């Protein structure tokens, strides 16, 4: 049996496209990573659908925790091992075989669920394979989520429940257990984890107030004073069967006496069934609960808080319940060693019920009350009690008689408005009505939770099919750009969806009103108002309602929402845009006269990169991620949020749009572009190249002037007269100290644009303007402690003319550009990591500009044979300017890396503002020569016409 047939047998499903399944289990396959990326979103949505349907009353945080446990790499890796999928993987890296084998052996020894992972970390390849297979199934069943779940459901068992998560030891116990096992202590799973922790901690019982008898008698009861029936406005007949649950103390426990169990019972006061009758239809919504026993384990160890009583009072105050009533139930022991047992009672008015619980035996009354309060808090936080409370509260929130908004004319008009915006008519309009009314109801939170994941999958599917050759990292960037919170909030405002919600939107907060006001003005990508969460949730909730109404059809969901979310960003859109957070950050700081600085470090534990933002040497924010550019982006976003709160600003205007503003520095002034005396004064711009990402960010510093001066005091307007510029020194700072870049590699990186004579470029024929282009050099500072003068030798980027480097000017139009020397300074605190395929990118740039292919050559080889370093150079010939650009790269251990290094420096040089100006000016000569020839031809034709006319007149005379 081959691998494909074996996987089909495990899934109990025969694939139509067996070739795709072969790709899904082959690590070196070009489709493997793409399928894994697709499958991750698919399984997340499948579990989201299941969890929301099974646990309709859980809060969003609980839903997220439950989904995270079920879609984690640890869970998926265990599924692969338990179903022997790892035997059929075609792995590329032999070292993975050992990791998979060790993990499989560890999983075989596990007896209980381990949502947080076991002792051996799961190899990611196992989880990736399961996700890849899931994507293959999803494609094979024509993108049907329901059919996928039917096939995968048995494979994904056991599905973790809220109780499974509650039974897991807290992180301190889990960490302690793993630490003990690492040093040779007993290594078992399940409840013995807590036992091991107990034994170790009890050695220090002098410093911990822990008694084994604390576990006795944990019980509470919920007493309802009258029977109740629950109503719902749902039009669909839904039947979920759950059972009555009882929490019973195990009487066989050696440390628990039978009388301790008496009356300590949690019971729901219905013997068999809890029926929920709908008020609008006769469809019964029935929950059947089977009896379950909850046994108190004597080895279960907990350390109770010192102020549990105060915390319980705070919970009651927050929920607007009466204060809890504490009382002493009994006193035990002799007078010199008394023992107290306390009880607490909580009355919840809106369900007309009472929670009552007895606590542990303690030597002091205060300790007994704190212990009791601790157990009551744990009980209130349990999923069972949350279910009971939410169900008991449902009649008042869902009772149609008490909620006239559901049938008001305002509600009907709101439903019609939303349907008109979506261009979609709901089958179940009650679903939309509930959404428009209840912001904090479980239904609203469930719709929001489902909608967010469904939209993400819809875009993932769209991008997967639209870009068949795109790598997962690029697909992820595109998906995030199209499903980000900013975009959701903008859609909610622009399309007017937020105006249709009646009860969902509370009194607008300042952030919401500011965002809506800003969106009412013309769009500005450099705003600093963060998207309010309430607006994001509204759109996600609408998406969830549509997704359920179209019967979980992802494709139909995208068809409905695509018009709202236009424009759909493409990869070209993202490449053309500067990274907005950096631009916003620098402009926000510059507006207030501040200077922004990024500093970098490593997290020793996780080995992640940390980026920190400083403003005038004062720490503002930080970001942490595996990639340094991601960490920097996170830090910039956090800094923008913090600075925008303390720096009142409505918009950050793009610097290029400041046409009508007058800026004065000294005696110079910048007048509007509509006046003739034109003197423009701008601040020096410092261009910083980031270490990892080669994106360019602009800092504006008030250090030097960039003036536009004319030869005469009066000139024509800008529309008639292209003006020359005199550019003062601009520093371009690159990263120097990088874990992947050696110090000697950055020595002597320089290039110069060489011209044998002063180049004069004719600019316009109407105005006497002369631009003189002087020689420019970008040189490493020789006084730097890491740069030796000899290192600059031969490392030259030069633009040399093959025939003539002197550009002629027109005698009647002397216009001169003067450019001063610029220094490129290497910043030792900014690391730089070169990409892997810069050589290919350089070839693409040359092809795009219709230049000949770049020529790579090995310039020198350094070091000994076992530690050899290679230096490569690259040369580009640009025919239309009759010039050649030449640059050397860094010393690298392999020829491929050396070529990529030289290509990287060439690309950065070509993208710099100075080089763009030089190439443009050099190309301008050819264009201007053509214009001059055309003008001369026109003048010649005019002369000929005049001559002909004069000849004709003479003949007539």
Curated annotation (Swiss-Prot):
Q: What is its EC number?
A: 3.1.26.-
Q: Which GO terms describe its biological process?
A: RNA processing
Domain of life of the organism encoding this protein: Eukaryota
Tell me, what is one Gene Ontology molecular-function annotation carried by this entry?
Answer: ribonuclease III activity
Q: Which UniProt keywords apply?
A: Endonuclease, Hydrolase, Nuclease, Repeat, RNA-binding
Start and end of every DRBM domain? Answer: 307-382, 566-645, 837-912
Q: Where are the transmembrane segments?
A: none
> Residue limits of the RNase III domain?
4-142, 415-551
In terms of InterPro entries, this protein maps to: dsRBD_dom (IPR014720), RNase_III_dom (IPR000999), RNase_III_sf (IPR036389)
- Gene3D superfamilies from the entry? 3.30.160.20, Ribonuclease III domain
Role description: Ribonuclease that cleaves double-stranded RNA (dsRNA).
Name of the molecule in the record? Ribonuclease 3-like protein 3
> What species is given as this protein's source?
Arabidopsis thaliana
